[in-house]
């Protein structure tokens, strides 16, 4: 196994362990033992736990970003794409809730460095979709795309993930809130168009749900 393969195996194992037991509850020694690897080998690849956590967050974000861009190629209706991205974010946040929340609590610099960038990228993607929908005449007059995204994030902040939350229940709550919010931005004609496409792309929502459950 070469260094890159070893690195990937370490990251995948660490994500599972951090998410199951928490970042504070897992030591570098624990990870080395789980992989039947010497501590020296582990520290040659990752100098400390912070570096390993960064790699874990990078992988989680890269997977989510790849899903967003792949979906953007397949979904033509901009407001449906915005809903899909919002729901997939919720599912990913639920799946990796403990990893993300404990990184934020115990390693705030690591969390802010990576999640600030990721959040900004998602905001820009949502904003571009809303701007495109506005240009096409799908939205009511006077809708500001940047403000709409900010209000959406404020709305979703009210849905805090609890440790015993069911993934599907949480994602449904987020999806329903986002759905109601997006409908409020649209004209009557665009709502009809939105609903006509909803069933057409329903399998995409089911696909992301299955992948992130």
Label the predicted regions.
Residues 9, 13, 17-51, 55:
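Helix-turn-helix
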Residues 24-25, 139-143:
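Short, charged helix-capping/linker segments at alpha-helix termini
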Residues 53, 57, 61, 104, ...:
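Amphipathic, non-transmembrane alpha-helical scaffold segments
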Residues 55, 66-98, 149-152:
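Hydrophobic alpha-helical connector segments
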Residues 71, 100-103, 159, 163:
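Secondary-structure edge/capping motif, primarily at the C-terminal ends of alpha-helices
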Residues 87-113, 127-128, 194-198:
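Amphipathic alpha-helical segments used for helix-helix packing
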Residues 110-138, 146-157, 161, 172:
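Amphipathic alpha-helical packing segments from all-alpha helical-bundle domains
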Residues 131, 168-213:
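C-terminal peripheral helix-coil segments that are non-catalytic and often amphipathic
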């Amino acid at each position: 196994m070469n260094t890159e393969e070893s690195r990937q195996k370490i990251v995948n194992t660490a994500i599972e362990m951090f998410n199951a037991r928490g970042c504070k509850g897992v030591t570098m020694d624990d990870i080395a033992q789980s992989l039947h690897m010497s501590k020296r080998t582990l520290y040659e690849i990752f100098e400390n736990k912070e570096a390993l956590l960064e790699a874990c967050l990078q992988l989680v974000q890269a997977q989510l970003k790849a899903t967003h861009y792949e979906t953007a190629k397949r979904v033509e209706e901009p407001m449906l794409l915005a809903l899909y991205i919002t729901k997939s974010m919720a599912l990913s946040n639920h799946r990796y809730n403990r990893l993300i929340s404990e990184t934020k609590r115990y390693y705030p610099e690591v969390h802010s460095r990576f999640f600030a960038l990721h959040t900004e990228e998602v905001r820009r993607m949502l904003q571009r979709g809303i701007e495109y929908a506005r240009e096409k005449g799908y939205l009511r007059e006077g809708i500001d795309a940047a403000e709409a995204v900010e209000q959406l994030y404020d709305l979703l902040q009210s849905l805090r993930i609890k440790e015993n939350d069911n993934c599907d229940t949480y994602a449904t709550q987020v999806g329903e809130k986002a759905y109601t919010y997006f409908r409020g931005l649209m004209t009557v004609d665009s709502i009809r168009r939105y609903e006509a496409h909803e069933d057409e792309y329903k399998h995409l929502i089911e696909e992301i749900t299955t992948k992130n459950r």
